[in-house]
Amino acid sequence: MDSSGSNQKPIIGLTTYLEQAQTGVWDVRAAFLPAVYFDAINRAGGIAVLLPPQPVDSGIASRVLDGLDGLIITGGKDVDPARYGQEPHATTDDPRRDRDAWEDALITGAIDRQLPFFGICRGLQVLNVARGGTLNQHLPEIVGSTRYSAGGGTFSVNEVTIGENGVVPGLLRDTPTLDVKSYHHQSIDRLADGLTVTARSDDGTIQAVEVDSMGFGIAVQWHPEQDGDDLRLFSGLVDAARTNRENLARTGKPQQPESA
């Protein structure tokens, strides 16, 4: 059977937490990811593979990406502000430098090889910082409320306005505004070169960006995995991963942006 055929489900890598965790009698440092992430990929037609933080060297991220058709940078703790030249705000999480370095290497490698990827919440911030942008470390000081960070493990609901052009607007077509689930206290401040904003909140908070040089390189500030009835963004990633794999098998070249 042709392993490059369209009947083969795309393999999507998802980054994970690496935190102290409890299960049964055990209280250990462990890699984990809420099941809603890989459930969404499975329901969208992909195979989910988990990618816990690894020691980063010049080749390890590339070898991992060799085995993937697509990538998701998932939600989690704040990016270390040292990565964008700032001291930590009082509310900023203690740094997870292993995860920061791992996800930076993965997302940089994905962009270099045109591997379709999707950043979610922290994933949007990782992308912006990896490409040279900065973050607002405590959004309530900017917008004057905790509308995006209710706390207590409760997602807040916010309306975002979707742009007219781009991959995200194309996937969410006929949806000029969207009620989304939010859980973040940071946001993009200075947008990195090579990224385009494709969704915002009414207070100006950037809610979606795309990599200009890619056929499918998107990130959103909200948590689409929390809406099990709307798989459009996950289906878009799975479809792009399948198309990219088929293009590579047929021509040796990855999927290109429509304008390329």
Feature map (PLM): residue ranges:
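Active-site-proximal beta-strand elements of phosphoester/diester hydrolases
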Residues: 218-221
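Hydrophobic, aromatic-enriched interface-forming segments
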Residues: 124-126
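N-terminal beta1-alpha1 cap of cysteine-dependent amidohydrolase-like domains
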Residues: 1-118, 128-129, 136, 140-172, ...
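Conserved G/P- and acidic residue-centered "switch" motifs that form tight phosphate/ATP-binding loops
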Residues: 121
